[in-house]
Amino acid sequence: MILVDTCGWIEWLTDGILANKYQVYMQDVESIIVPTSVQFELYKWASRVKNKQEALKAIALTEQGKVIPLTTSISLLAGDFSSEYKLSFADAIIYATAQNEHVELITSDEHFLNLPEVVYFKK
């Protein structure tokens, strides 16, 4: 199991410049941890850039993974990570979910650069 950050889903869905790097992880969607905050960000992005129908298709793909809702324990862990690593709310929730599930976070978001258990792809 792994957690692919929102930027990874976007790269993969749009065949972006890093799509081939994410493809290795996206081949088995069922093995991906998907925080509901990633679903929120992906839906918001796809609705804005594409349309509601495409946004719902993207969310349907995420539903094939293991969707993790925001819980009290993840919220508290995120609060600690936000303070310790100066992460935004959404980034802290995503990182806390990965840590709570004991999986690596796969991302190209610089906010996660050099954090433990992160695989980072430079844009």
Where are these regions (language model features)?
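General small-molecule cofactor/ligand-binding pocket signal
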Residues: I33, I68, V119-F121
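Short hydrophobic interaction/assembly module
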Residues: K50-I74
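Short, well-structured N-terminal submotif of metal-dependent ribonuclease cores
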Residues: M1-V34, A46-K57, K123
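Structured helix-beta-strand junction loops
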Residues: D28-V29, Q64-G65, E101, L115
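Acidic, PIN/NYN-like endoribonuclease modules and their adjacent C-terminal/linker elements
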Residues: M1, A96-K123
